[in-house]
Amino acid sequence: MASPGASTVFLLALTILAGTQALTPTHYLTKPDVERLRASLDRPFTSLESAFYSIVGLSSLGVQVPDVKKACAFIKSNLDPGNVDSLFYAAQSSQALSGCEISISNETKDLLLAAVSEDSSVTQIYHAVAALSGFGLPLASQEALSALTARLSKEETVLATVQALQTASHLSQQADLRSIVEEIEDLVARLDELGGVYLQFEEGLETTALFVAATYKLMDHVGTEPSIKEDQVIQLMNAIFSKKNFESLSEAFSVASAAAALSQNRYHVPVVVVPEGTPSDTHEQAILRLQVTNVLSQPLTQATVKLEHAKSVASRATVLQKTSFTPVGDVFELNFMNVKFSSGYYDFSVKVEGDNRYIANSVELRVKISTEVGITNVDLSTVDKDQSIAPKTTRVTYPAKAKGTFIADSHQNFALFFQLVDVNTGAELTPHQTFVRLHNQKTGQEVVFVAEPDSKNVYKFELDTSERKIEFDSASGTYTLYLIIGDATLKNPILWNVADVVIKFPEEDAPSTVLSKNLFTPKQEIQHLFREPEKRPPTVVSNTFTALILSPLLLLFALWIRIGANVSNFTFAPSTIIFHLGHAAMLGLMYVYWTQLNMFQTLKYLAILGSVTFLAGNRMLAQQAIKRTAH
């Protein structure tokens, strides 16, 4: 706990407000994210395709593979001159490696030119055109464009359209690329919006990232601003960079390509504004530090950062406006040492300028300025209810404890008065949490009251035993009085043992047994009452019911004894034996159903037994009919 004499301290806790009018980036590649992405791309080559993803992906991040000569040798040794895909991977990979030249034959050139046909898929056309471009070979751009347009009309998938954009970026600027450029607007219309924050294709992250990379590469090539709104760019960015771990090389490659496109294009460069660390600055150096970067966390050191205004959240009063940040290394600093901020929350409106490509360059930062609370003018009084005796007042200085004890009974009340001030500015404070806690030294009983300020911000707590006996359960004794001060903007929350107070209640109100009122004791265990079973009927009723059930069987035996049982026609043919065994089994199944099975299980078994018994019984009766006819 700090004393009132402690030095002034501002604690700044910064968050970017989500409720601002302009959409701000919620996901981007932090420096650890960039390193993780780099590690995902920097893998041993297993094929020419994997080499392409690694080499070109790392190149998008501004990094070369560790061993360029070894990578170039791998490309040459794995190149298949008769395969368009292999030529594409080799051409694009060698372009990203310094000093890696690959020579190809005329037959290979003819193979690539032949692949630029409307009979080829869009993927094959893209790979052939990009390979020709990578090897520096001439190409009839208008013919390639015609083949691409014709084939695209047959393949209307999102990925095929994205590959058409990638293909067009390798064609001559003299070709009429408007039909391909118009596809961008159609693709934007096919994007799915999620919660107003994310924008992506249902095909997934990889396709979305490739679309962003292809769009800006083509627009830089033709010199036209893409038909994508700024908010849509931020939504695409949020969707692409929301994933930090990548399942495949191709996915990591697509994210790296999108990041490079959003960081280095001629039209839209999203700005990321991040408070640096968790600042804790003294009054002599009250500084707000901001990192201003692109999506790859690369500092925008040429930017200009300005504070439009700073407003108190509570009063909405403007306390600072039109102030520039100072660039210091890779960060921008705002020194508000000369501004007397009272504790609380402030909304800082910050704008980044210096390049007309910047988007999402206006952000709102919520700044919490903490201070230290001081307790002054603490008076403890005992006031006679009849006012026949002058109040006895004792002043206490924090953090000391008052000497002696104070008495509150049926004749006199106890009162506590105090004020709370900002030790840095001297201004009065009204924290959110101001409690008086009374702790019974003998039983551990605790009673907590809220201290409220009056119109002059003087806090008062008065204890009248006749009015408060319910809270105390009329339990007399010596109570320790604690003062609790807390608030989110306070650097030094206070728990102060102020004094001992003897509270006396009338003996007739005292409880027979004083129980602890500790708020943190376990609750009484809940005993669950189960429903009592219904009474069984008398034994006579049960026996009578059983006799009635068995009476048909007894009647059967009696009739057999009187008229005789005709067993002369019983045969030991298989059908006869199976029929009677099946009938007995069904009766046994009824018993098992009663004791163990449910209805559905019983029906399943009954269907099997019944079918066998039916067929056997039918056969048995047929044999009996034949026997009678013969006689």
UniProtKB/Swiss-Prot annotation:
Pathway membership: Protein modification; protein glycosylation
Self-association state and partner proteins as the record states: Component of the oligosaccharyltransferase (OST) complex. OST exists in two different complex forms which contain common core subunits RPN1, RPN2, OST48, OST4, DAD1 and TMEM258, either STT3A or STT3B as catalytic subunits, and form-specific accessory subunits. STT3A complex assembly occurs through the formation of 3 subcomplexes. Subcomplex 1 contains RPN1 and TMEM258, subcomplex 2 contains the STT3A-specific subunits STT3A, DC2/OSTC, and KCP2 as well as the core subunit OST4, and subcomplex 3 contains RPN2, DAD1, and OST48.
Protein's job: Subunit of the oligosaccharyl transferase (OST) complex that catalyzes the initial transfer of a defined glycan (Glc(3)Man(9)GlcNAc(2) in eukaryotes) from the lipid carrier dolichol-pyrophosphate to an asparagine residue within an Asn-X-Ser/Thr consensus motif in nascent polypeptide chains, the first step in protein N-glycosylation. N-glycosylation occurs cotranslationally and the complex associates with the Sec61 complex at the channel-forming translocon complex that mediates protein translocation across the endoplasmic reticulum (ER). All subunits are required for a maximal enzyme activity.
Topology term for the membrane: Multi-pass membrane protein
Chain segments annotated as transmembrane: 541-561, 572-592, 597-617
Listed name of the protein: Dolichyl-diphosphooligosaccharide--protein glycosyltransferase subunit 2
A Pfam family that the UniProt record links to this protein: Ribophorin_II_C
Ranges of the Lumenal topological domain: 23-540, 593-596
Gene name of the encoded protein: RPN2
Keyword presence, Ubl conjugation: yes
Entry GO CC: oligosaccharyltransferase complex
Family, similarity comment: Belongs to the SWP1 family.
Chain residue numbers at which the record places covalent cross-link Glycyl lysine isopeptide (Lys-Gly) (interchain with G-Cter in ubiquitin): 154
Glycosylated residues, chain numbering: 106
Keyword list, A-Z: Endoplasmic reticulum, Glycoprotein, Isopeptide bond, Membrane, Signal, Transmembrane, Transmembrane helix, Ubl conjugation
GO BP terms in the entry: protein glycosylation; protein N-linked glycosylation
UniProt topological domain (Cytoplasmic) ranges: 562-571, 618-631
Subcellular location: Endoplasmic reticulum; Endoplasmic reticulum membrane
